[in-house]
């Protein structure tokens, strides 16, 4: 129903199977995969390992619940932000997305680590009392970089629309 309403039924084919069952028989190249399953680390990692080889260079991997859920958070931190096979990483709400590449450049690595740093600051602000952290961020001059990061994320998401 949602796929038809979004008018993407000509390019999106829903598969009603577990991720593991679907990956075993899925033999087409994947341009976009959205992983939203169990939140335990081992399951998210398994989903990543099953689908990563099927995603084409230039394709997008996206993961849901990557901010406050430990499993998805650990997987994207290790296999996306710290990987040499992803660039143009972004976060919208609780979704982290990245473009697969054969091997990223040094500038991509630096940008990925920078966004990981900003993400960790954002997570800290969500988890701990906000007032205290705003004071610390102000004293450490982190407010402006956070605002710039938010603007960059908005620009990246607008380009994809």
Question: Predicted segment positions?
Answer:
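S-adenosylmethionine/decaboxylated-SAM
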Residues: 1-161
């Amino acid at each position: 129903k949602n796929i038809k309403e979004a008018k993407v039924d000509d390019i999106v084919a829903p598969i009603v199977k577990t991720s593991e069952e679907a990956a075993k028989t899925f033999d087409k190249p994947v341009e976009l995969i959205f992983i939203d399953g169990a939140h335990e680390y081992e399951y998210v990692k398994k989903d990543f390992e099953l689908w990563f080889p099927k995603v084409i260079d230039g394709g997008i991997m996206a993961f849901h619940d990557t901010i406050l859920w430990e499993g998805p958070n650990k997987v994207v931190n290790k296999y996306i932000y710290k990987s040499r096979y992803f660039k143009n990483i972004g976060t919208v709400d609780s979704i982290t997305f990245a473009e697969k590449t054969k091997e990223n450049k040094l500038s991509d690595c630096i940008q990925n680590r920078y966004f990981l740093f900003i993400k960790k600051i954002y997570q800290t602000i969500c988890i701990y009392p906000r007032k205290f952290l705003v004071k610390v961020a102000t004293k450490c001059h982190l407010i402006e970089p956070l605002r710039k990061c938010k603007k960059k994320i908005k620009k990246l998401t607008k380009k994809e629309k």
